[in-house]
Amino acid sequence: MALLEICCYSMECALTAQQNGADRVELCAAPKEGGLTPSLGVLKSVRQRVTIPVHPIIRPRGGDFCYSDGEFAAILEDVRTVRELGFPGLVTGVLEVDGNVDMPRMEKIMAAAGPLAVTFHRAFDMCANPLNTLNNLAELGITRVLTSGQKSDALQGLSKIMELIAHRDAPIIMAGAGVRAENLHHFLDAGVLEVHSSAGAWQASPMRYRNQGLSMSSDAHADEYSRYVVDGAAVAEMKGIIECHQAK
C-alpha cells in the first residue's frame, strides 16, 4: 500500500496528521519559505509526543541549495542534533553551483546521519541532470527522493516521476508538490509508492486585536494573522483513497 507522508509545521499539526492516518511526518518551519529547519524546542516536543515516524527537514534558509561554509556547518550540527534526539530519518539536500549534487558535502551529511534514513528533498527538482543525480544519490545511500518531476507541481511532472521510478537501482521516489485528494488517484495508478502532501490550509489567527498596517516581513502585504495548519479531514480522505486503491 502506498505510504502517505504529511508536511507539518508544528507539533499540533503533526499530532493531527498522526490521528488521521498519516504514515510519516516531514517536520518543518516557515511554510512561506518552503520549509526550514525546525527549532530545537519543536524537535524535542514532537519527539516526545508523536509516535509515527517523523523526519525533520534540515534546511537553514530559503532560496537555492548551494550553501556557504557557515551554512553547511549549521546543517551538519542540525543533522547531529536530529540523530541524537532519536529521530528515524531526516530530509535535506545540497547542490553545487552547476546544479549537480555536492557529493563531498553530501558524504559528510551521510556520515553525520549514520543509520538515519535520509530523504533528498526538492533540491532534486533544481538539479541539472535528474538521471545522473539519481545515480549519485543511489551511490550515497540516500533512502528516498522527494520530487515534483522537476515541474511546479507533481501532477505536471508525473511522466518524469514515472521515468525516475523505472530507473534501475534508484532510491524510493516520493511524489510531492500539489498532491491532494482530488488528484491522488493519478499517482496511485502510476505506481507511486510514497506520496507527500501538506494536506492543509491557511487558518485565521484567533487574535481579536489586529494592527493591520504592520508586517513582520519584507513583504508589506504579508498576512500576519493567518497560519498554515494540517486539515485532519484532508489527511483522512487521502488515507481512505489509498486504502480503497489497495483493495482493488
From Swiss-Prot:
Single GO molecular function: copper ion binding
Family matches, as Gene3D superfamilies: Copper homeostasis (CutC) domain (3.20.20.380)
Keywords from the UniProt entry: Cytoplasm
GO cellular component: cytoplasm
Domain of life according to the entry: Bacteria
Record family assignment: Belongs to the CutC family.
HAMAP family xrefs: CutC (MF_00795)
Record's subunit section: Homodimer.
Protein's UniProt name: PF03932 family protein CutC
Protein species of origin: Escherichia coli O81 (strain ED1a)
